[in-house]
Amino acid sequence: MNILIIGATSGIGYGLWQHYSTSGNRVAVMGRRKAELDVMARTAPDHTVASVCDIADTGSFDVAFDHIVGELGTLDLVIVCAGIGELNPELNIVTELTTVGVNVTGWTNCIDRVYRQFSEQGRGHLVTVTSVGGLQPTPVAPSYSASKAYQINYTKSLQAKSKGTGIFVTEIRPGLVDTRMAKGEGLFWVMPLDKVTRAIIRAIDRKRPRLIVTRRWRVLNYLLKHFM
């Protein structure tokens, strides 16, 4: 397969690159950290195409995306992991607007460009990584929880839009994962990255429309959705 992972230099995206780049696929990776991307390209040179890109810069993303399509020809699977999350109890406006710029504006441009590419191809599998945090207001990170609620509903809209086409859309909705984005002391139910990555790979292989990972977070997801 020809695969693109957006937000691949750490966390879930990096774990997915490790799997797919060692499974006979050609994997394009995008991220902000050039040093990490260079290491990835050197580690699996025959299976990795790297492109430095910050999705908040929509023009830069469009150029990088067109370059990737030119390199790979077609895209079979695109996984969008890019995003930021900062604790912001003081409501620092720079933090709030930066979060919106990445998780809403940049993310939407990214998703839209991928979906249009799949429409041109007549097929493709889009995977978004949202968060259980999008189901409940978060006083210490209001912009983050609001942005994840946006992503959840945008993904649902694309799932409805893609019915009857060759495009399939999967939403991955994790709880707290042991990555750079999990911030704070004594975090509740933090999940090991390798366990989460394996579950995501299975869901993608089976083309599940949605995965709430792991099981304990599925219970919390149900409670938040129906009783909060």
Name what the model sees in each region.
Residues 131:
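Residue(s) in the substrate-gating loop at a strand-loop-helix junction
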